[in-house]
Each structure stands twice: as structure tokens, then as C-alpha cells.
């Protein structure tokens, strides 16, 4: 096992419903350490840049509109195998297919408004974390 850092975003649908605290508590209860946190609103251009890997996918424009529709909460979590374990905590992309007790099952509305985003690989985390946080903003 190795200690990793991963990015998690609380998406606009969950922020609108004031679920940030519940989501943070849920992840902390699983033993992860919160090392960075900020609330912000992405512009459409920033959302397009962040999700550039999905540029050719049919849902790209709708995703970017949604992610820039309201405030989000960006977080960096640290822990043993954080990337894969936090993806398990988040659950399947589609809340209807997510396991009971996962964040998306608990708080997601549909496949688009599924409450949270998380880095899907070490390579993604290395790109996604610095998109939102400088080294000075990450507390050991």
C-alpha cells in the first residue's frame, strides 16, 4: 500500500443542497486526511479546460455547462491507496447503479448530477490537483 493524494470535487448539484459537510464527514470517517479545501465557481472555459479529456464525448458540452452553473468545492484527500479507495466511496457514475452507502447513491440525482468527481488514476490526480491547488495551498 502507498499513501496517495487525490482530487475530489463536490459538484454544483450537491453544493446547492448544502451537502459539502456530509460528504467531507463521510470521507473523513473512512480514515482519509483532508489536506486542501476551497469553494469556487468555475467559468465555462475553466470547466472545458478541466474536462478536456472528454472533449470528443457527446456529454462534454452539457458537463461543462453544469460544472460552471454554480459553486463547487475542491478538495485534496490523502491516505493509503486514496485514488482507488475514494472512487469506491464515491460509487458508480450513475447513482442508480451505485452501491448502497456510496456518495453517489446517497446524494446523486442522475448520471450528470451525481454529486462528486474524483481522480480516476495517479496520472489524472497529478494533473487535476494542480489545476485547483498550488503547493502552498496543500497542508501536510
Curated annotation (Swiss-Prot):
Its EC number(s): 2.7.4.6
InterPro entries with a match to the protein in the record: NDK-like_dom, NDK-like_dom_sf, Nucleoside_diP_kinase, Nucleoside_diP_kinase_AS
EC class (word): transferase
Catalytic activity: a 2'-deoxyribonucleoside 5'-diphosphate + ATP = a 2'-deoxyribonucleoside 5'-triphosphate + ADP; a ribonucleoside 5'-diphosphate + ATP = a ribonucleoside 5'-triphosphate + ADP
Pfam families: NDK (PF00334)
Subcellular location per the Swiss-Prot or TrEMBL entry: Cytoplasm
SMART domains for the chain: NDK
UniProt GO molecular function: ATP binding; metal ion binding; nucleoside diphosphate kinase activity
GO cellular-component term (any): cytoplasm
GO terms of biological process kind: CTP biosynthetic process; GTP biosynthetic process; UTP biosynthetic process
Sites where the protein binds ATP: 11, 59, 87, 93, 104, 114
Active site: 117
Keywords: ATP-binding, Cytoplasm, Kinase, Magnesium, Metal-binding, Nucleotide metabolism, Nucleotide-binding, Phosphoprotein, Transferase
Summary of subunit composition and partner proteins: Homotetramer.
Family of the protein in this entry: Belongs to the NDK family.
PANTHER family per the UniProt record, alphabetical: NUCLEOSIDE DIPHOSPHATE KINASE
Function: Major role in the synthesis of nucleoside triphosphates other than ATP. The ATP gamma phosphate is transferred to the NDP beta phosphate via a ping-pong mechanism, using a phosphorylated active-site intermediate.
NCBIfam families: PRK00668.1
Protein name: Nucleoside diphosphate kinase
Name of the gene encoding the protein in the UniProt record: ndk
Amino acid at each position: 500500500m502507498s499513501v496517495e493524494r487525490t482530487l475530489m470535487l463536490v459538484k454544483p448539484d450537491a453544493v446547492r443542497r448544502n451537502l459539502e459537510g456530509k460528504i467531507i464527514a463521510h470521507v473523513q470517517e473512512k480514515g482519509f486526511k483532508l489536506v486542501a479545501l476551497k469553494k469556487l465557481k468555475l467559468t465555462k472555459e475553466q470547466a472545458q479546460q478541466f474536462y478536456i479529456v472528454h472533449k470528443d464525448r457527446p456529454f462534454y458540452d452539457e458537463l461543462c455547462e453544469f460544472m460552471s452553473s454554480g459553486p463547487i468545492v475542491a478538495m485534496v484527500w490523502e491516505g493509503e491507496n486514496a485514488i482507488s479507495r475514494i472512487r469506491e466511496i464515491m460509487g458508480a457514475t450513475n447513482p442508480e447503479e451505485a452501491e448502497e452507502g456510496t456518495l453517489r447513491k446517497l446524494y446523486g440525482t442522475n448520471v450528470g448530477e451525481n454529486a462528486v468527481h474524483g481522480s480516476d488514476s495517479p496520472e489524472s490526480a497529478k494533473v487535476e490537483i494542480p489545476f485547483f491547488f498550488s503547493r502552498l495551498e496543500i497542508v501536510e
